[in-house]
Each structure stands twice: as structure tokens, then as C-alpha cells.
Design a protein with these regions (language model features):
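Extracellular, disulfide-bonded carbohydrate-recognition/adhesion ectodomains
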Residues: 1-123
Length: 123
């Protein structure tokens, strides 16, 4: 089961924000909902999210460039597998990940986009 206004898919619940904000705000908002920014597991999940967002605009996910070394890292601290999910766009110390259509893009973390939270569905 998922809370009201959340979408169920498999064993996960997803929530898409109505309005935009920056990446840090988005991350904290998900935490406040006892969830985290979306961490993609598969191409099928990306396709599902694309169907949910529909308009093709940028949507924040739980991906950020972390120093040192400037590697893409998910919000749980695990590294991104670039072979599975390549990221397009420039990368610097202030880069965060978003979904646009069927791909992941790098954007400045201060950019204002909608975001997606995810959590485990209650059994």
C-alpha cells in the first residue's frame, strides 16, 4: 500500500511534486515524507517515470556529483553505474541529476524543477 497521492509500482511508492524547487529542497522534502529522491534501478523504472511525468520537462532524482573525484552518487551513497545510466551534460562540483524524457541529464543543483520521491510500499 502507498499513502494517498502516491503511485504504486511493484514494491515501491512514487510521489511527483506539483511545483518546482532546487535539488537540496527536493531531497529534504522527500526526507520529510519518510522517503528519498528517486534512485533508478532499471530502464523499466525510467520508462514508468517518463509515463508519469509525461511533459518531458526536467525532474530531479536522487543523483549528485560528490567530491572528491566528482563521481555521480545516489542519495544513499552508492555510486551510479554509468554503463547502465549514462548522464548527459557538463559536470562540476555543483551538478545534480534529473530525468528528461528517457535520459538522465546533469543540471546545476540550484535549478528549479519538479522532483520524485520514492519509498517502499507498506505490506
Amino acid at each position: 500500500l502507498c499513502p494517498r497521492d502516491w503511485l504504486l509500482r511493484g514494491d515501491k511508492c512514487y510521489w511527483l511534486s506539483k511545483g518546482p524547487n532546487n535539488w537540496n529542497w527536493s531531497r529534504d522534502d522527500c526526507w520529510g515524507k519518510r522517503s528519498r529522491l528517486l534512485m533508478l534501478q532499471s530502464q523499466e523504472e525510467l520508462d514508468f517515470i517518463q509515463n508519469v511525468t509525461q511533459d518531458g520537462k526536467n525532474v530531479w532524482i536522487g543523483l549528485k556529483v560528490t567530491p572528491p573525484g566528482g563521481k555521480w552518487t545516489w542519495v544513499d551513497g552508492s555510486p551510479l553505474d554509468p554503463a547502465r545510466f549514462p548522464v548527459s551534460g557538463s559536470v562540476d562540483g555543483n551538478s545534480c541529476g534529473c530525468i528528461r524524457g528517457r535520459r538522465i541529464e546533469s543540471q546545476k543543483c540550484s535549478g528549479s524543477f519538479r522532483w520524485i520521491c520514492q519509498k517502499e510500499a507498506a505490506v
